[in-house]
């Protein structure tokens, strides 16, 4: 496999996770991304001093491999629980789903470690 090279299209979560696993297996990998930054739907954009999440506002963890990645990110301070409240008229109640997570300081914090 020494002369085999891999091209991964897209530096979002799926593309970077794929490239990361290939690199861990000592494969030669090149990631191609058309945007200026990493993240895809988990991208954090900047305009001057303002940073904002450009795509997904939160993630959920449903698969075991992704849950392990989220647990590592949580311990490293790159992920935090998000407990939104639903508002209607003058009433508010907790959202029905408990495993909503947000990247810290932005969603792209979840993909940056995979790009190393």
Regions inferred by a protein language model and the residue ranges of each:
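N-terminal FAD cofactor-binding segment of flavoenzymes
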Residues: 44-86
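Short beta-strand to alpha-helix junction loop
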Residues: 58-65, 79, 87, 91-113
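Glycine-rich FAD pyrophosphate-binding loop
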Residues: 7-11, 20-48
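Alpha-helical elements of the RecA-like P-loop NTPase motor core of helicases
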Residues: 40, 68, 112
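Core beta-strand elements of the Rossmann-like FAD/NAD(P) dinucleotide-binding domain
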Residues: 2-4
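N-terminal Rossmann-fold NAD(P) dinucleotide-binding loop
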Residues: 15-16
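A conserved beta-strand/loop element that lines the FAD pocket in flavoprotein oxidoreductases
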Residues: 116
């Amino acid at each position: 496999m020494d002369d085999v090279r891999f091209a991964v299209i897209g530096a979002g979560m799926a593309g970077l996770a794929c490239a990361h696993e290939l690199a861990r297996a000592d494969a030669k990998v090149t990631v191609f991304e058309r945007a200026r930054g990493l993240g895809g739907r988990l991208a954090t954009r900047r305009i001057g001093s303002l940073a904002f999440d450009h795509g997904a506002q939160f993630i959920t963890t449903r698969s075991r491999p992704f849950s392990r990645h989220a647990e590592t990110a949580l311990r490293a301070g790159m992920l935090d629980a998000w407990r939104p409240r639903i508002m209607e008229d003058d009433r508010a109640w907790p959202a029905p789903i408990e495993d909503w997570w947000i990247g810290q300081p932005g969603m792209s914090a979840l993909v940056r470690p995979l790009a190393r």
